[in-house]
Amino acid sequence: MITRLAIAGYRSIRSLVVDLAPLTVVTGANGSGKSSLYRALRLLADCGEGRVISSLAGVGGLDAVRWAGPERGTMRGQRTEGTLRSGPVSLRLGVATDHLGYAIDLGLPVAQRSAFDLDPQIKQEHVFAGADPRPAGVLVERKHGSARAMADGGWAELARSLHPWASVLDEFAGHAEASELAGARRMLRSWRFHDALRTDATAPARQPQVATRSARLDDDGANLAAVLQTAIEMGGERALSAAIDDAFPGSSLLLPMSDGRMQVALEQPGLLRPLTAPELSDGTLQYLLLTAAMLSAEKPELIVLNEPERSLHVELVPALAARIREAAEATQVVVVTHQAALADALGGTRVELEKVSGETTVAGREGLLDQPVWHWPKR
């Protein structure tokens, strides 16, 4: 389980450390930084997939996402003024778990003639044991082009000339001297994100789908029917039936198949025929998609939901909250929401964000000293 998340130098987040629980609910007003926290988690997952550089380049590079305020921030109530930068531009992301942690420090490229000047560079990476990447707990260390791993006899060199766009998670995941890299990579790659699931008229979830066993929901929901059928065959029929009846009393889920394709249909009281996926309301389809994500046969280490209440009528919120709470019994869940009704129904651990002088902070904290401890390695 993820125990601590640290973000520094990202959009409206100058320095933020939060502890995560089995179910964490992130709330806050519009513009408070909820989306920045969500995107930072996605960037960490991109590190596990080897695409963090391309993801940042795709949105305009480090200049487009770095901390947007003064280098040292602004005291509450004071006027924000520009200052001369004394340190390097840095985007730092880190996560600690019960077993392993991972931290990355990204910076601007050294001035050179290149068509890829928007690409940030990896300055440091650390895989560690414990609550943060302090020296005593570091297991693998990468500084610029050099990388080394802690072995029985001390430090073992892994590389001296790593490319600035190459991560140690990709380059040495199978290295005999650094088995922790494979564990950290596997942890990050297991995370699942669900954001703005499509429910429009041409949404993939409304189309007949290839009938093939599917252990998890695709990002676009294209395998909705297959995920639900897989969950049924893996012992989830009772939970799925309860989820449908909870939201739509007296209704039954059908998964008709023809010519190797299947689709979702809903049999409802008072109707003479089932309604197929193209006929379902946006809210009904959204609920089915989220239910599939929560009940899928594959149980990731982390599920992150960004504003799952979209398109849902308020009457469906208690049923959705029940599905999320049930999922959190087997999988860690982070929910980012601005709906008070959903946040209250979920319970869990609340992290309320607010903006103070343009900077995202956790409501109720007095300052940087009033947050969980995290030591960023120096460059």
Placement of each model-derived feature along the sequence:
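N-terminal pre-Walker A segment at the start of P-loop NTPase domains
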Residues: 1-14
